[in-house]
């Protein structure tokens, strides 16, 4: 039986096949992405550099000698590679377990192509049944946002002791019945004090590389 870590490593290396020479790549955050960053270091001479979604990923990229770029200084971004906490058959995702959801969402929006790399434990039929939806909030709005999330049917829990790279707080929302992920994403985003929500339904993955016991399964959004 192939271990979960081995599956993560396999999809991390598989993602290299989608990278063109002399381009700048968006890179996400998480344990699967850590394997991708290791793989990326093997072709670092062939790429221009990387836009990173978190300080954690930036630190790893710097150690490996991979140049970092500011998204504001780029005209376009060809590709973004990141993992997910959950992904469904429609390529909609829950992300943000590592707390980097806002920057992840910005880079995903900016990129022409979004590739999600996961092991098959992350693939679900319905989002939100296995874990919470992370919501990044302005600290002073935590209570107000929590009340609004309860009105939407959720059970928000403050992620104690966690401050995002943007200086904000995280609410993990349990018990949310997700029948229309895109609509729910919009509703949560519209709550004053919400910075971003870890539902990636409006900007879905274009390609998913899923590590399974039988090999790598590839899903396309179209």
Curated annotation (Swiss-Prot):
It catalyses: aldehydo-D-ribose 5-phosphate = D-ribulose 5-phosphate. The active site is at residue 104. The keyword Isomerase applies. Keywords: Isomerase. Pfam families: Rib_5-P_isom_A. Its EC number is 5.3.1.6. Gene3D superfamilies: 3.30.70.260, 3.40.50.1360. One of its GO terms (molecular function) is ribose-5-phosphate isomerase activity. Catalyzes the reversible conversion of ribose-5-phosphate to ribulose 5-phosphate. Belongs to the ribose 5-phosphate isomerase family. This is Ribose-5-phosphate isomerase A. It comes from Blochmanniella floridana. The lineage of its organism: Bacteria, Pseudomonadati, Pseudomonadota, Gammaproteobacteria, Enterobacterales.
